[in-house]
Swiss-Prot record:
One of its GO terms (cellular component) is mitochondrion. It is found in: Mitochondrion. One of its GO terms (molecular function) is monooxygenase activity. Heme binds at E307, C443. Its EC number is 1.14.-.-. Belongs to the cytochrome P450 family. The keyword Chaperone does not apply. This is Cytochrome P450 4e5, mitochondrial. It comes from Drosophila mettleri (Fruit fly). The lineage of its organism: Eukaryota, Metazoa, Ecdysozoa, Arthropoda, Hexapoda. Its cofactor is heme. Its main location: mitochondrion. InterPro entries: Cyt_P450 (IPR001128), Cyt_P450_CS (IPR017972), Cyt_P450_E_grp-I (IPR002401), Cyt_P450_sf (IPR036396), Cytochrome_P450_Monoox (IPR050196).
Length: 522
């Protein structure tokens, strides 16, 4: 009883202190166009109830404010969507503006302070320590494992797509990418593709991403303390336990392998010393003259389990979906496979052959333009920043709009047209196309992700003809059948047409389709 009384008495004081600190920011950011909201909620009530509605609202605001930076308020938290390439260049190249936004604090119970969420000197030291794990030579070693996992994936697809069945390609891809990150960077085999019915961690990844995204746009749920009293907390706690148990099991298995191998030989050039997986690197590393503790190892392994699995799922799934809608581009990919591999299309493509597939590279680039795996990147201003005359006030959330760049007709001509050759004929500026971010906090695993993407798509087009869920959905004009990036009126027109198999895009940390990505394989 007294606890409740104390809380009720403290709330007005806390609100006064909070508003005293936060209200001046509204004046500091006035030069940026903004959408008026209501007291206490700001624009939170306008954002929508689902991740898909939130993404659509961002695009509607972007069109409303002439495709430039704009500001919204979530409660009294200032949020600026940055879509100006000149501003993005300054922000991404900054060596001081590298703090991730405060929303990432909600990831700490799960990921701790790994590369995704850490800041300052810890981030710099850990980034330097982990970088060798994704060295060019190690990627070549990983490639054969990627081929083996792709073969298992193809076998699974043959089974579920038999009889012209419509399959959810997005759902199937989750298990492929989980196997890939475990078998390569983690050095642990879990056989998720073959044992999918017993792998509950995939659902846990999906649930946690959804939970974090919804909390971000509900001001009261941002507080860990208040969130404990929400009806969703029980699901969150169960999901968190599943994810943490899975990561700790991965670490325990690799510790056993690490100790056994180290006991057999410590000779330079041995298989063990030459081919270290991420957990091995962490177990052997020192920071400031000391070994990493158990929590630090957990943080980096859990971070790479999430980023290496979830972002690549998005990339592979949307690339497969695009194949189903664009038969001409699929034909060009197949012809390139023949040109590079000759008549031996049933064997694995080598690392060198994948590297020689230039149209495949263009296809992946264009797929990442229209469906970037990470649609937004967050930064947090720890002081006032003057960026080309625009003040970004201290304590502001910056949402770097990777996805909106791809639909900006000032950067890409006919942005709703899927046209891989655009990257051959007119290359965008270095900060007009940034699907893997740029600058000091760029994606450390981008070469790994691209190699996996190319390996899977190469094998897919050599094995199947990829078809849409229904024949009518083949693109006849080269344009994407998607609502994202469209002005409100055009989006509503397409919705009335009722294409139930068109993706309903949502930004749940990574890009997903709420209704799956459906296609057929023949």
């Amino acid at each position: 009883m007294w606890f409740i009384v104390y809380i009720l008495l403290a709330l007005p004081i806390m609100l006064f202190v909070f508003l005293s600190c936060e209200w001046p920011k509204r004046n500091d950011a006035e030069q940026i166009e903004w959408s008026s909201g209501v007291p206490f909620l700001g624009n939170a009530h306008q954002m929508g109830k689902t991740p898909a509605e939130i993404l659509n609202t961002f695009f509607e605001f972007w069109h409303k404010y002439n495709k430039d930076n704009f500001r919204i308020w979530i409660g009294y938290y200032a949020n600026i969507l940055v879509s100006n390439p000149k501003h993005l260049e300054v922000i991404m190249n900054s060596t001081t503006l590298i703090e991730k936004l405060d929303i990432y604090d909600m990831l700490h119970p799960w990921l701790g302070e790994g590369l995704l969420t850490s800041k300052g000197s810890k981030w710099h030291k850990h980034r330097k320590m982990i970088t060798p794990t994704f060295h060019f030579n190690i990627l070549q070693d990983f490639h054969q494992v990627m081929n083996e996992n792709s073969a298992k994936f193809i076998k699974r697809l043959k089974e579920v797509s038999a009889g012209d069945n419509i399959i959810d390609f997005q759902d199937e891809t989750h298990y492929l990418t989980l196997d890939a990150i475990c078998d390569t960077a983690m050095g642990v085999t879990i056989n998720a593709i073959e044992k999918r019915d017993t792998v509950d961690v995939v659902k846990a990844f999906k649930d946690m991403c959804h939970i974090i995204n919804m909390r971000a746009f509900r001001p009261l749920q941002r507080s860990d303390f208040l969130y404990r009293f929400s009806p969703e907390y029980a699901t969150y706690a169960k999901t968190l336990k599943t994810l943490k148990d899975f990561t700790n099991d991965i670490i325990a298995k690799r510790i056993k392998v690490h100790r056994t191998a180290a006991a057999k030989t410590n000779q330079e050039g041995s298989e063990f010393s030459r081919k270290k997986m991420l957990p091995d690197t962490l177990l052997s590393a020192t920071i400031d003259g000391r070994p990493l503790n158990q929590q630090e190892i957990y943080e980096e392994v859990s971070t790479f389990m999430f980023e290496g699995h979830d972002t690549t799922t998005s990339g592979v799934a949307f690339a497969g979906y695009i194949l189903s809608r664009f038969p001409e581009e699929q034909r060009k990919l197949y012809e390139e496979q023949q040109a590079v591999m000759g008549n031996e299309l049933n064997r694995d493509a080598t690392f060198q052959e994948i590297s020689a597939m230039k149209y495949l590279d263009l296809f992946i680039k264009e797929a990442q333009r229209v469906y970037p795996s990470v649609p937004f990147i967050g930064r947090y201003t720890d002081k006032d920043y003057n960026i080309h005359g625009t003040i970004m006030p201290k304590g502001t959330t910056l949402n770097l709009g990777i996805i909106v760049l791809g639909y900006d007709d000032r950067v890409f001509e006919e942005p709703h047209r899927f046209y891989p050759e655009r990257f051959e004929k007119q290359k965008p500026g270095p900060f007009e196309y940034v699907p893997f971010s740029a600058g000091p906090r760029n994606c450390i695993g981008q070469k790994f992700a691209l190699l996996e993407l190319k390996t899977v798509i190469s094998k897919l087009v050599r094995t199947f003809e990829v078809l849409p869920a229904v024949d009518e959905l083949v693109s006849k004009d080269g344009n994407l059948n998607t609502y994202v990036g469209l002005p409100k009126e055009e989006k509503e027109r397409k919705e009335r047409m009722g294409y139930k198999y068109d993706p309903i895009l949502s930004a749940v940390l990574t890009l997903k389709s709420e209704n799956g990505l459906h296609l057929r394989l023949r």
